[in-house]
């Protein structure tokens, strides 16, 4: 009977860690218990095996349970010694390979759908908190001042005061009524006739003064209806010029915004700039030809690769991509992944929301799967300009690396330094950081070394190359090894070779997808024009748009933190749920604001340009620019927060006369691209009503700001008290710690911050100084010389002649005075 038992068993040599087509048949035929034990162990280590066994019929599950119970009872006595050795070897191989299932069958094809997508995250947006809340709570940030609490507290106080006033009014009315009744009784007793006013109810409906309320209400409704929007394209607007006066006004508004009218100054400047740009372009073209490596021309069409399987990626990477529902690579991913796997330097550019993060994370993970594992080493550094972007990239990367053994660490300001140092001691494979915190650990953390870095990624590289980050980036680039792979990505990548040379690129490959600074084709761009003299009513226009037109999932961008905070208070007083996001907030507050907006707790996110780059929040329907940004590049990043990953979106810009250049550039680029551009007309009367509401709340806004400032001072005082107590208790330990160093002085840091603010918002108005008359004259003279109107100029003789005349005249006058004095004495 022994030979028959051998025939029914599955040969050990043929067993591989893949999905077997006859797996269930083996279980039904009563396979060898040692082999089934190996099957059970691999099923527990693989999620796909779990899903397949879960979908098997109930009878088979019962049989498997019986087999497990029999194995527990009998142990290894039933299985042969050879089978035990084979099982131990298989377990060791599975442990060494991590979560990889071993060798693949040559004809095996990874199934992206079906069982593999059972754990798919629908609508993955990169902001699912894994350990962000815990780390935020542990970082020791002081308790933030909540504007909503202040507003609700003041509202309760006002309601209480109003109730007290109403009670007093009721008492006073009762007293007056009692007095009136007493007087009426006295009058009746005197025999006077009473006047009955109830006959007024029998007046005709068309009598004088009747229906006045209805006319007012109809007028208000008509005004409300008139505050609609004209969302027709430019081609439709040109055909509506003939009509009533209202139509003419609307058409003029549309043409003035959607169709840019050439300004004389702009035309002169454009002519001068065109000649200069032609010379610069020729020089830059020669530099680029020598600097960039030639892009490899492929015979395949861009849409030929329909799946990530065509890149020959490892199975754990494919499983991670399927878990976040990434099935078809985007154009930038199709171009980047093959080149990045070869280890070449890359300068990549694509429109917002095109998957640039996955374009560099996927090849990094693929290369790290083949790294030496004996000694833990940090090999990759990914630098981001903002904390929110670093947290988002960390979440995306960890999701994609779920089925691998690659470790990550995020070095972001606002979190605990001690916890980050403890993680750095374990030498994580990938470090995702902001430049400031990266330099802090690089100089002050003894367990952190950058000598082993092999890959450097700069996301939003054009922002990182600006003056605000120049010093920090130079400090990092001069410290890390020069023999590295460097990848730069941005939606508005700079073409300046001089800036790219600073990064230390080695014959980079330039991968440009939609390199003409285009927007998404699913984005509709709207413009609301403010006539000259109505710039002060800008907030009224914003409140009308947010309360009547765009009521949910809206990001509003501001240039200044102060303005964003003030509008946040106005929204709270008017009952609009909003959160703010800017640099004056703590990291805990910033993450809380993004989470509240992502989860739908608030409908509006009031942000500065801190949130304009890279922030990917699912379901953002509208982006409103409270005022146009400083440049067209910043405008592209702002409006790129919506209409991402194939979804539709809308961008609305409130533009005044100073914003004419940016609007003109946006309209020109949109027309060249064929994007949807429309004009929205808001009735001035409606905007004035909302502006009047804001003016009525000015005192309340100031009171809220004062109370908030008082609470901040109280929190700072409490923090100072706690700091003093800690110094008294642990003074020796605190003073023994080495002082943290930085590569810049305080003056240099202030100068770099000032340069960064100038890049975003232009030169500050405070820097403008009134010219003296001497400076004005000097400028006028230089202008005249430049125009060729140099007139006659005095020579040496002409300049000396007035001086001689003055001296002679002075002597004559003194002689006359002396003669007059002598005459007076005589």
Swiss-Prot record:
EC number: 3.6.4.13
Lineage: superkingdom: Eukaryota
Biased segments, Basic and acidic residues type: 139-176, 285-308, 764-788
Basic residues bias (residue ranges): 59-74
Gene Ontology MF terms in the entry: ATP binding; ATP hydrolysis activity; RNA binding; RNA helicase activity
Xref: CDD domains: DEADc_DDX27, SF2_C_DEAD
Example GO biological process: ribosomal large subunit assembly
Motif Q motif, chain ranges: 306-334
Catalytic class of the enzyme: hydrolase
Ranges of residues in domain Helicase C-terminal: 538-690
Gene Ontology cellular component annotations, sorted alphabetically: cytosol; nucleolus; preribosome, large subunit precursor
Comp. bias intervals (Polar residues): 128-138
InterPro entries in alphabetical order: DEAD/DEAH_box_helicase_dom, DEAD_box_RNA_helicase, Helicase_ATP-bd, Helicase_C-like, P-loop_NTPase, RNA-helicase_DEAD-box_CS, RNA_helicase_DEAD_Q_motif
Biased composition (Acidic residues): 11-42, 82-110, 177-203, 213-252, 267-284
Residue ranges of the motif DEAD box: 459-462
Purpose: ATP-binding RNA helicase involved in ribosome assembly.
Family statement drawn from the similarity comment of this UniProt entry: Belongs to the DEAD box helicase family. DDX27/DRS1 subfamily.
Subunit (UniProt): Associates with pre-ribosomal particles.
Protein name from the UniProt record: ATP-dependent RNA helicase drs1
């Amino acid at each position: 009977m022994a030979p028959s038992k051998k025939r029914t068993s599955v040969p050990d040599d043929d067993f591989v860690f893949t999905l077997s087509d006859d797996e269930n048949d083996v279980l039904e035929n009563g396979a060898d218990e040692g082999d089934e034990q190996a099957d059970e162990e691999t099923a527990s280590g693989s999620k796909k095996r779990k899903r397949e066994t879960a979908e098997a019929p109930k009878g088979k599950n019962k049989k498997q349970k019986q087999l497990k119970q029999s194995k527990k009872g009998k142990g290894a006595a039933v299985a042969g010694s050879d089978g035990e050795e084979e099982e131990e070897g298989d377990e060791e191989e599975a442990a060494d390979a991590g979560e990889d299932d071993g060798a693949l069958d040559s004809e095996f094809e990874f199934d992206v759908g079906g069982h593999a997508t059972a754990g798919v995250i629908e609508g993955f947006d990169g902001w699912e908190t894994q350990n962000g809340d815990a780390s935020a709570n542990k970082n020791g940030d002081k308790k933030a001042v909540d504007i909503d609490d202040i507003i609700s507290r003041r509202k309760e106080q006002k309601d209480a005061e109003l109730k007290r006033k109403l009670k007093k009014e009721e008492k006073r009315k009762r007293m007056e009524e009692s007095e009136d009744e007493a007087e009426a009784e006295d009058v009746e007793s005197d025999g006077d006739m009473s006047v009955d006013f109830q006959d007024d109810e029998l007046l005709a409906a068309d009598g004088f003064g009747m229906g006045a309320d209805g006319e007012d209400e109809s007028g208000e409704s008509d005004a409300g209806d008139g505050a609609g929007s004209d969302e027709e394209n430019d081609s439709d607007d040109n055909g509506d010029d003939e009509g009533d006066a209202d139509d003419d006004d609307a058409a003029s508004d549309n043409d003035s915004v959607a169709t840019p009218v050439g300004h004389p100054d702009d035309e002169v400047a454009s002519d001068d700039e065109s000649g200069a740009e032609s010379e610069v372009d020729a020089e830059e073209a020669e530099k680029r030809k020598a600097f960039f490596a030639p892009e490899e021309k492929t015979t395949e069409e861009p849409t030929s690769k329909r799946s990530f399987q065509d890149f020959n990626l490892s199975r754990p990477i494919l499983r991670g991509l399927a878990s976040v529902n990434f099935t078809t690579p985007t154009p930038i991913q199709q171009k980047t992944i093959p080149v990045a796997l070869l280890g070449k330097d890359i300068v990549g550019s694509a429109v917002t929301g095109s998957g640039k993060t996955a374009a560099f994370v996927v090849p990094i993970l693929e290369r790290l799967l083949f790294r030496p594992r004996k000694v833990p080493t940090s090999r990759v550094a990914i630098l981001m300009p903002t904390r929110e972007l670093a947290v988002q990239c960390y979440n995306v990367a960890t999701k994609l690396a779920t089925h691998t053994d690659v470790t990550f660490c995020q070095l972001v300001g606002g979190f605990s330094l001690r916890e980050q140092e403890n993680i750095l001691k374990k030498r994580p494979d990938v470090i995702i950081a902001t430049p400031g915190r990266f330099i802090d650990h690089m100089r002050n953390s003894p367990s952190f070394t950058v000598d082993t870095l092999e890959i450097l990624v700069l996301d939003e590289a054009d922002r990182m190359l600006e003056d605000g980050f120049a010093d920090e980036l130079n400090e990092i680039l001069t410290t890390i090894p020069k023999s590295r792979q460097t990848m730069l990505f941005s939606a508005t990548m700079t073409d300046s070779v001089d800036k790219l040379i600073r990064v230390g690129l080695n014959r980079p490959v330039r991968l440009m997808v939609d390199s003409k600074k285009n927007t998404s084709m699913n984005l509709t761009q709207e413009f609301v024009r403010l006539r000259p003299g109505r710039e002060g009513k800008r907030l009224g226009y914003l409140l009308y748009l947010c309360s009547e037109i765009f009521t949910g999932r809206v990001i509003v961008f501001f240039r200044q933190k102060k303005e964003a905070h003030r509008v946040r208070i106005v929204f709270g007083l008017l009952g609009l749920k909003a959160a703010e996001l800017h640099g004056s907030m703590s990291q805990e507050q910033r993450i809380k604001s993004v989470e509240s907006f992502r989860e739908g707790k608030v409908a509006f996110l009031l942000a500065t340009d801190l949130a304009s780059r890279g922030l990917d929040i699912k379901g953002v329907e509208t982006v409103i620019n409270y005022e146009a940004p400083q440049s067209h590049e910043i405008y592209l990043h702002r409006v790129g927060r919506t209409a991402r990953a194939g979804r539709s979106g809308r961008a609305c810009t409130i533009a005044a006369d100073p914003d004419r250049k940016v609007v003109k550039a946006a309209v020109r680029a949109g027309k060249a691209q064929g994007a949807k551009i429309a004009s929205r007309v808001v009735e001035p009367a409606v905007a004035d009503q909302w502006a009047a509401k804001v003016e009525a709340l000015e005192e309340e806004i100031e009171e809220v700001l004062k109370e908030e400032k008082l609470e901040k001072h109280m929190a700072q005082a409490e923090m100072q008290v706690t700091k003093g107590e800690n110094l008294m208790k642990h003074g020796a330990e605190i003073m023994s710690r080495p002082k943290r160093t930085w590569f810049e002085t305080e003056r240099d840091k202030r100068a770099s911050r000032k340069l960064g603010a100038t890049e975003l918002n232009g030169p500050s108005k405070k820097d403008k100084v009134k010219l003296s008359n001497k400076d004005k004259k000097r400028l006028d003279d230089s202008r005249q010389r430049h125009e060729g109107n140099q007139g006659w100029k005095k020579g040496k003789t002409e300049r000396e002649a007035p001086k001689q005349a003055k001296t002679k005249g002075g002597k004559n006058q003194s002689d006359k005075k002396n003669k007059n004095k002598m005459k007076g004495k005589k």
